[in-house]
């Protein structure tokens, strides 16, 4: 159903013949609504409650039908607070699922779960809307070609490459550079692939969402002077929202991303932070609807809900949605049903390490813990695979030797091990790289490094050709030529000091 969000508001369609019901029961965010016989709304239809509360304040609450109870009653979950609602209030069945604005007009804007802008920049300039509940693409529409999604970030492209149209889990605590990595990916995808990004804040801290918005404006990902030039649309359903909103905000973001893929035929990057909160909200709604809890108190429909969301994130013959999802692991237990269900859908994992961040190596991606199903010789080619394996072996050997170095010192190592350590330290530093979005903080210009350049650089380090260069020459540079140039500059500086 095509509706006009500028006149009727996103998420609400105007029907000539209104189907009216009345509230019969309110339990927190859950409403029971009675409709006339034969006029029952469908599951997932949006219902709207309009009116005034006891002190005359205007009420406008949108709900989503979840269950048909019999006796002409339905049970719906509210997408905003139900304060002020009373039994007997009139409810309008919109006759369609929640619909949100889609297309280029959404870029640079912040939306809530209903697709309403919340950034005080006025209404969204589009008449095109799309329902948030859709089927996953049909089997014949899928693009099964295995191709690497080049990010321009050396450590990711070499050791844990992303799949075009794949799903990536981003594991990291606070302060290790997760936000900066997300912003750099948004920036690089826009430049290298002409792509756009959609960020879905699911059950986030409001402060973090605000920080991300401010940093995006500062780094130019969102262009304040010309909003149309922005590269990202933001959709937020924060921690303080009712569970219905937190459960559906991921679908709102996904719907906006699907339009860019299917209609604009673009490569889209979809960020979901945090996928665990999506599961958590589903668990709350499940309990409110009276379903029997399953393992560890989660909803019995956990796998279905996760699958419904994840199966829509895929590559078609038109374009692709590549999804990067932050994954919170409750009590660091990877066997918990929420992360365990998420793992089944992931193609790659990018693990951020506090140890590397403490050393000042950014991006602080752990080269040994991060994994990818794409790192196979038949997909990435023999040269890439061999280089990646040798880099990992060198770093692993360095890790094993660190205890010996700490106790006895470098001098006690064999000649071969000393060489391995020297190369590993160069590799560790060469895995760092200056980011475009961090230019304002570091003062050094950002670098996008192509995959071929990345492989060439690491092959040169492993071959021993660069053993004579100081390790600081490899820190925060782009390709290997910049490292050799930096080494020459360092040598000249030291001569001048003498």
From Swiss-Prot:
Alphabetically sorted, this entry's keywords are: ATP synthesis, ATP-binding, CF(1), Chloroplast, Hydrogen ion transport, Ion transport, Membrane, Nucleotide-binding, Plastid, Thylakoid, Translocase, Transport
Q: Which Gene3D superfamilies match?
A: 2.40.10.170, Bovine Mitochondrial F1-atpase, Atp Synthase Beta Chain, Chain D, domain 3, P-loop containing nucleotide triphosphate hydrolases
**Recorded E.C. number(s)?**
7.1.2.2
Query: Catalyzes what?
Result: ATP + H2O + 4 H(+)(in) = ADP + phosphate + 5 H(+)(out)
Topology versus the membrane, per the UniProt entry? Peripheral membrane protein
One GO MF term, please? ATP hydrolysis activity
Where in or outside the cell? Answer: Plastid, Chloroplast thylakoid membrane
Any keyword Thylakoid?
yes
Mitochondrion in keyword set:
no
Q: Which domain of life is it from?
A: Eukaryota
SMART domains given for it? AAA (SM00382)
EC primary class: translocase
Q: What is its main location?
A: plastid
Tell me which Gene Ontology terms the entry assigns under biological process: proton motive force-driven mitochondrial ATP synthesis
The record lists ATP as bound by 172-179
Q: PANTHER family recorded for this chain?
A: ATP SYNTHASE, ATP SYNTHASE SUBUNIT BETA, MITOCHONDRIAL
Q: How does it assemble?
A: F-type ATPases have 2 components, CF(1) - the catalytic core - and CF(0) - the membrane proton channel. CF(1) has five subunits: alpha(3), beta(3), gamma(1), delta(1), epsilon(1). CF(0) has four main subunits: a(1), b(1), b'(1) and c(9-12).
| Family named by the database record | Belongs to the ATPase alpha/beta chains family.
Q: What does this protein do?
A: Produces ATP from ADP in the presence of a proton gradient across the membrane. The catalytic sites are hosted primarily by the beta subunits.
Q: What is this protein called?
A: ATP synthase subunit beta, chloroplastic
Organism annotation: Eucalyptus globulus subsp. globulus (Tasmanian blue gum)
- Species classification: Eukaryota, Viridiplantae, Streptophyta, Embryophyta, Tracheophyta
